[in-house]
Amino acid sequence: MNIPENLQYTAEHLWVRPDENGHWLAGITDHAQDLLGDIVYVEAPKPGTRLSAGQPCGLVESVKTGSDLHAPLDGTVTAINEALQITPEEINDRPYDAWIFSFEPEHAPTGLLSAAEYRALLG
């Protein structure tokens, strides 16, 4: 299983990383996409949506099931990856390139997991 060292993670199987504009990108992990199977639909939170850490903010659906996206941190959504509306299967092919939404954190990020901590969570 692929767990890049340069990303941070949540217990709800999201990865996050800062982008060059000071916002953060969020997507689902390789583990999550593997459990879901073939992804057919992504409902990302709309730009301007207020995020509350740990609360549902979107949805990923596969041929097997649907899974809520949980906000990684408090903040505000700044953009969504429009390409995933047309080709959601990109998440299966490249989970760490296929970001779902970007957001501006309300405060300095805390409570995120390192790659080693996420790996330990998975067992």
UniProtKB/Swiss-Prot annotation:
Q: Cofactor note from UniProt?
A: Binds 1 lipoyl cofactor covalently.
Per the record, the coiled-coil ranges are: none
Its required cofactor(s), as named, are: (R)-lipoate
Identify the residues that the record assigns to the Lipoyl-binding domain, covering every copy. 23-104
Record-level GO BP terms: glycine decarboxylation via glycine cleavage system
Keywords linked to the UniProt accession = Lipoyl
A Pfam family per the record: GCV_H
Its job: The glycine cleavage system catalyzes the degradation of glycine. The H protein shuttles the methylamine group of glycine from the P protein to the T protein.
User: What's the family?
Assistant: Belongs to the GcvH family.
What protein does this entry describe? Glycine cleavage system H protein
